[in-house]
């Protein structure tokens, strides 16, 4: 299983990005969370298999039709939290 931290920049807040990300994570089987960051980006922590992560990464690069993704930063997630599902955090 891979554990990744993604930072998504662009026009990604107030456009339903978190809701659509929640839906897509559910379809793919990703666990973790999505939340808005104070500076206007969106943070996503994702846990899944190689195939699940590849599909989720591809989706995050495009985002929902209501958003404009300018950049996707990907890092290994160093946290110790165990995720049972995918959720929106505030």
From Swiss-Prot:
Swiss-Prot/TrEMBL keywords: Hydrolase
> Which reactions is this enzyme annotated as catalysing?
an acyl phosphate + H2O = a carboxylate + phosphate + H(+)
One short Pfam family name for this protein?
Acylphosphatase
Question: Keyword Electron transport: yes or no?
Answer: no
Which EC number(s) does the record attach to this protein?
3.6.1.7
Which residue range or ranges hold the Acylphosphatase-like domain?
Answer: 3-90
Name the SUPFAM superfamilies for this protein: Acylphosphatase/BLUF domain-like
The name this protein goes by in its record: Acylphosphatase
Gene that specifies this protein? acyP
